[in-house]
UniProtKB/Swiss-Prot annotation:
Natural source organism: Shigella boydii serotype 4 (strain Sb227)
Protein name (Swiss-Prot/TrEMBL): Anti-adapter protein IraP
Domain of life of the native organism: Bacteria
A cellular-component GO term for this protein: cytoplasm
UniProt similarity note: Belongs to the IraP family.
Assembly, per entry: Interacts with RssB.
GO biological process: cellular response to starvation
Coiled-coil region(s): 1-36
Compartments where located: Cytoplasm
Entry-linked Pfam families: Anti-adapt_IraP
Role played: Inhibits RpoS proteolysis by regulating RssB activity, thereby increasing the stability of the sigma stress factor RpoS especially during phosphate starvation, but also in stationary phase and during nitrogen starvation. Its effect on RpoS stability is due to its interaction with RssB, which probably blocks the interaction of RssB with RpoS, and the consequent delivery of the RssB-RpoS complex to the ClpXP protein degradation pathway.
Length: 86
């Protein structure tokens, strides 16, 4: 029983570490996208936003991906492009 608990705690710690790493990657990408958008001319910025939105619109999600997940991704991309980090 102790071995099982120790094994589960180890797996939990590994998952937490993976989660932290993914969060750091997302934060880094947000910072980069924000910096790029801020340094673009307004018309270039708008063109990029339209291209990304167009690409998202054309993508047909896999049937195994829940609609909620797809909508979450679309909303997050929209938020990042239209309201970059402060």
């Amino acid at each position: 029983m102790k071995n099982l608990i120790a094994e589960l705690l180890l797996k939990l710690a590994q998952k937490e570490e993976e989660s932290k790493e993914l969060c750091a990657q997302v934060e880094a990408l947000e910072i980069i996208v924000t910096a790029m958008l801020r340094n673009m001319a307004q018309n270039d910025q708008q063109r990029l936003i339209e291209q990304v939105e167009g690409a998202l619109y054309e993508v047909k999600p896999d049937a195994s991906i829940p609609d909620d997940d797809t909508e979450l991704l679309r909303n997050y991309v929209k938020k990042l492009l239209k309201h970059p980090r402060q």
